Amino acid sequence: MNKITKARFEIWIKEWDLITKQITDRSGQSGGGLYSFVNDPENMIQEIEQRLGLFLPEDLKDLIRFGYFHAEVDWAFPDGILIPFPNVSEGDLGWNIKDMDFPGLFDDNGDEMQQRRYLAFHMAGNGDLLLFDLESASGSAVVSWSHEEDEFRLLAPSLPDFFERITKLGLIGAYGDSYVPFLGADGLEPDGTNGQLWQAWLKDYRELQWEDVQNDLPAALRLFEMIASDDPELTPRREIGPLLKEYHSVEDILREWIARGEEPQPKRNRRDRLILIGEAMGSDAADWVRTLWTAKAGKDAAERPTSEAPLVARREADSGNDAAQDPAAFLPEADEGVLHRLAAVCLPEDEGLPLVLRDIEREARQSGRRISPPTYSLAAFHSRRVIPWIEPHVSFPFSGWDTLLAASRPQAEDLIRWLQSADALRMTAVSAIGLLPEDEIPALFAGPNGHAERTELLRLLETLHASAVLRKEKTAISEAIAALAFPLT
């Protein structure tokens, strides 16, 4: 494509609007298109050329003559979904021809150098740039500049070629790394292997509906991996299992879903899929989770010093755990974080919580370090039984411990005890009160002593506030007092 026509440009705009609408409708994230127009394009062209001291390439003049001197078109995926290319998580197409300029670049010695080859027309959120290469044959070749690598990457030999290619790829960008999977010698290759894979995936993301795939298990799993984000208000993961079980057996679901981890894909997806399976299937996946823990036990046993081998062998023999002797069964992506989360969401608390606590303690012994806040490992249990375990480990800085305390369903007596304890426990409790969900706070005082317990909590907090010296501490204590300021029925 050698020239932008008004008709083709208007078709692109319709495609961009459709892409952003379909993606944002599904993702629940903000996005859309914003265009700025000019009534006197020829005057704007003259002003820009005078300011820059050059004649604009015809492609840029055409864009201004169509009236579109400025545009912002964007979309974003929610966190937590499984995408085929980890760095492609948003779309960001934009330009501002009126204000484009020559960016200052730096030489190998770190000295800024003046240049008039690359004309920046859009900046990504991380500082990466989209630029025109004025020395290219068309004068409007589009390149990406990565601020971290200080590297230029050709995206298309001309502006119309760029629009055509980036439209096929769903407006990905403008972070420099997001283009890398699709680059060839001549820039972006939407019809290359990765480009075709991405286009097929994005088409399904935009168009697939549950009614289309409910009887097709592989397609249903593909859909849920696309839409099961970390945002519980979008597609709650706990609702996926019951939906699948209406049409498929638990055995078939687990077998097919686990097998998807053997397909070529980013390493991160293999790991995240295991967590998704557990959160979706819950207790239906308990036996599978037990096999993962058994495999981990075998791996840990194989890695112990030789001097410990006889003791390990006796323990395994006593437990009758044959699978634990086979470290080859261990999945590399089933790391401690994965196993701890799966224990929380799939196993009974009486079984899963002791497993995780022992694993955390074992790791601390082996490393010789203090236990850091195991928030990710323990928060998912939402168990008050976590609280007495963490008490002896809490220290300054308490960040992480407060989050874990708030997630562990504390009762008023727990908070009172912590507020009467050492400084680290006291300030952790103060911060945790401010982190408690508003709708959970009344449950603190649901018992027969609720009025007396709240009175004591407020007394302790007010005493702390009166003696606090640092403004940060006073603010945190004030927030805790405010959180407890509601009428008891």
Regions found by a protein language model. Give the residues of each.
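Broad, structure-driven detector of short, well-ordered beta-strand segments within folded domains
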Residues: 128-135
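Compact, glycine/acidic-enriched structural inserts
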Residues: 145-177
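Extended alpha-helical scaffolding segments
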Residues: 409-414, 418-476
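Eukaryote-biased recognition of electropositive, low-complexity segments
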Residues: 174-186
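A short alpha->loop->secondary-structure connector
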Residues: 139
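Terminal, low-structured helical/coil segments at or just beyond the last alpha-helical repeat
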Residues: 473-489
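A surface-exposed partner-binding patch
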Residues: 1-128, 177-180, 196-211, 216-220, ...
